[in-house]
């Protein structure tokens, strides 16, 4: 255990954790129990924090992309903008996903995080899922965007996590060039899947290991449940390339306060 902690401490001094963080705010006003005006203020605060702390990306709802673009350009910041497509259930048709993605692209999104139709996958509709991956990934890559496929690990058993991760990987390898692989992620979770009390609905070390073992050469994004500096470092140590979290500020603040140790 001591060696593992020492390794993490070494890693903390050789990389900037902010480059891994997709600072995330995806609650609607109703979900946050706020008015629309109050919720937009929360969104603005999240965007400003991403700018201030120089996170890799701010992840917000599609109807907030233009706002993020305006604030980031005004600040002359390098923070990129991500949004979610067919969120959070992923049950929409290819056409629905494409339409949402086209609007997000037009509004200035850099990353497109699609929720895959995991329910169709569970039911055995493999070709339908493959077609989603092919068509939507092509749209994103043709517009020089990063594409991420959310598989919703909390809805899957271990065997299904392995199968769906491998399906995305094999589909991308079969239809896109090697230079594009690093631009197509497999992502763990929406953070909105309802689980029994006490059961995690996001990334766990166990599920991320399964994804990493079966996604290569595609990168993995751990999303949901990563809330501390130590957890973020451990995920990076495992091999994830991005971390989606609503606790990005706390993660970085912890890093700053612990930097002398």
What do these predicted ranges mean?
Residues 13-41, 138, 210-218, 226-261:
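Alpha/beta catalytic cores of nucleotide-metabolism and tRNA/nucleoside-modifying enzymes
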Residues 107-120, 176-197, 226-261:
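Glycine-rich phosphate-binding active-site loops on the catalytic face of alpha/beta enzymes
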Residues 19-23, 27, 58-60, 81-85, ...:
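Hydrophobic faces of well-ordered beta-strands that scaffold small-molecule active sites
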Residues 12-94:
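Conserved N-terminal beta1-alpha1 strand-loop-helix module at the mouth
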Residues 89-103, 123-132:
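Glycine-rich anion/phosphate-binding loops
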Residues 94-101, 157-166, 226-239:
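Catalytic cores of alpha/beta
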Residues 69-86, 127-148, 166-172, 200-221:
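Alpha-helix-loop-beta-strand connector modules within alpha/beta enzyme cores
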Residues 111-183, 191-194:
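Conserved anion-binding
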């Amino acid at each position: 255990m001591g060696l593992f902690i020492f390794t993490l401490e070494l890693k903390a001094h050789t990389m900037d954790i902010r480059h891994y963080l997709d600072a995330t705010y995806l609650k609607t006003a109703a979900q946050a129990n706020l008015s629309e005006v109050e919720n937009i203020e929360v969104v603005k605060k999240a965007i400003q924090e991403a700018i201030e702390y120089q996170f890799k990306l701010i992840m917000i709802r599609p109807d907030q992309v233009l706002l993020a673009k305006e604030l980031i350009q005004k600040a002359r910041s390098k923070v990129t903008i991500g949004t979610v497509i067919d969120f959070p259930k992923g049950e929409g048709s290819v056409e629905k996903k494409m339409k949402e993605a086209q609007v997000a692209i037009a509004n200035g999104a850099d990353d497109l995080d699609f929720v895959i139709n995991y329910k169709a996958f569970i039911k055995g509709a493999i070709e339908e899922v493959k077609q989603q991956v092919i068509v939507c990934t092509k749209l994103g890559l043709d517009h020089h965007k990063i594409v991420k496929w959310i598989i919703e690990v909390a809805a899957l058993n271990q065997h299904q996590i392995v199968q769906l991760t491998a399906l995305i990987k094999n589909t991308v390898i079969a239809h896109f060039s090697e230079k594009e692989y690093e631009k197509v992620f497999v992502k763990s979770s929406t953070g909105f899947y309802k689980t029994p009390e006490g059961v995690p609905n996001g990334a766990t070390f166990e599920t991320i290991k399964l994804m990493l073992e079966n996604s290569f050469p595609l990168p993995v994004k751990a999303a949901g449940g990563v809330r501390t500096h130590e957890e973020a470092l451990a995920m990076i140590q495992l091999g994830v390339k991005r971390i989606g979290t609503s606790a990005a500020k706390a993660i970085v603040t912890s890093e700053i306060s612990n930097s002398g140790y």
